Amino acid sequence: MRLGFDHYTIAHRGLTPEQALWFAREHGLEGVQFLEPASLDADLDPGRLAAVRRQAEALGLFLEIGLPSPNPVRLSRQEGREVSAAEHASRLRPHLEAVASLGCRDARAYVGDRHDRFRSDVSWSSQVAATAAVLRELRPTLLDLGLKVAVETHADLTTDELLKLVSDVGEDVLGVTLDTGNLLMRLDDPLRAAERLAPHVRMTHVKDCVIAFTPRGLSWQARPVGSGVVPMTDILAALARANPALNLSIELHPRIYDLPIFDPGWLAHFPALRPSDLAAVVRLAADCERKYAEGSLQRPEVVEAIPWDVRDLEWLARSVGYLRPVVGILSGL
């Protein structure tokens, strides 16, 4: 397992792709995951993409990449008209070709942001079905290029929904990008979810998190890897058993997210929620509250008062410091 980071962690610093690769090298990391090919070159210029690939290879770094969302409902909303599955797939094909030109075999993608599940104009199930239709349109291209789309646990899909999507579209063209911290945002028991997803995981976003009780239910905040309540060593062990060559890409960011589980209307958007999963998340919140009370863990609002550009590098360094020995142990298994 090699240890890298997702460019989103330092996107606010305005580094070019070349500078981001050097940043990884200078900070002892082994690779970079970028948002999508257009973040390397807006025109998907083959020469420009080839230059980034050559630099990564020269520095001995792995290069990972994502795609624009295959959810056509998001694009329809942006353009104010209905975009068909065939049209959206045709727009994504040049991005897939760019992914292949970078030497990548997998491309991260997300179905929705944290708001899409709760939209009143288009149901979440309709959005997932529309996304599946786009991905089916892309099957021949993916097979021809030898690529898989690795759909992320992106504060949108539950584990059940993601596994069904992989099954419906086909394991030969679809996999998973596992975000370790986001699992709790969709009310999944993180360890159980990771164990179920592990056989399909192709890419990662490794982050920790904390949970707190609020008058509306819960709040969620990312934390440096190893400093929160995600059962990280157990999750990483499950991933290592399934794929010892998996890259681990650290992804960290600011902000506190609201999880109003006391609101029946909000909770109704999780019709298949298992009591055991919700109980696992609430138990982790209780663990956090105990640590807040004893002073061994800072409350989310205290941490969030610190500007992100003041804590980003420290968080990254702490995450690397935690993961290095863990990866070393897992690599020896």
Residue ranges with predicted function:
Residues 57-58, 62, 75-175:
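Active-site acidic/histidine proton-transfer and metal-coordination neighborhood
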Residues 6-10, 35-39, 68-72, 112-114, ...:
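Active-site beta-loop-alpha junctions enriched in small/polar residues
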Residues 1-104, 136, 171, 272-333:
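N-terminal pre-domain/capping segments
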Residues 2, 18-25, 159-173, 184-333:
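Histidine-acidic metal/acid-base catalytic patches
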Residues 14, 42-46, 156-160, 184-187:
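Loop/helix-junction capping segments adjacent to catalytic residues or to phosphate/diphosphate-binding pockets
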Residues 41-47, 69-90, 113-126, 216-223, ...:
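Surface-exposed, active-site-proximal loop segments in enzymatic domains
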Residues 3-8, 32-34, 61-67, 107-109, ...:
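Hydrophobic faces of well-ordered beta-strands that scaffold small-molecule active sites
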Residues 45-51, 85, 89-92, 124-135, ...:
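Charged helix-capping and loop-helix junction motifs
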